Amino acid sequence: MSLGYNFCPLVREICDKYGVLLIADEVVTGFGRSGAMFGSRGWGVKPDIMVFAKALTAGYVPLSATVLNQRIEAAYLDNCDARGLLMTGFTYGGHPLACAAGMAVLDIVEQENLPANAALQGEYLLGQLLPFESRFRSVGNVRGKGLMLALV
């Protein structure tokens, strides 16, 4: 959970150095839970590919997405007869209800500034939990970002 601020930027640097794509799985960390819109961005990292789901519709309807950087998008545009479309899904795999739910959730996340609220509430909760490290022998440490906290 708490990786230290330099860890993720160092991973980004290594990926860039060796030409490796950095893929961020934001299924759990996306849409504000970590105190930033996406966990990777909260660590100061811009991945090449992001995948997310669940929180995109607040769990009401199944929906997931894969987001690509401009370089990868350009590769599809340059090498595809379908004008850059990613022909990897099927019509029965997505539907207007899920997309409408996703748009509604994104509106609420933005309007209510949920990432900033998660950061604020998480800071408070972390402060309340930190004394557990010295109070309970079974708690080694308390760590995390935003509302993604752990007692380890």
Language model features by range: what are they?
Residues 1-152:
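Conserved N-terminal phosphate-binding loop of PLP-dependent enzymes in the Aspartate aminotransferase
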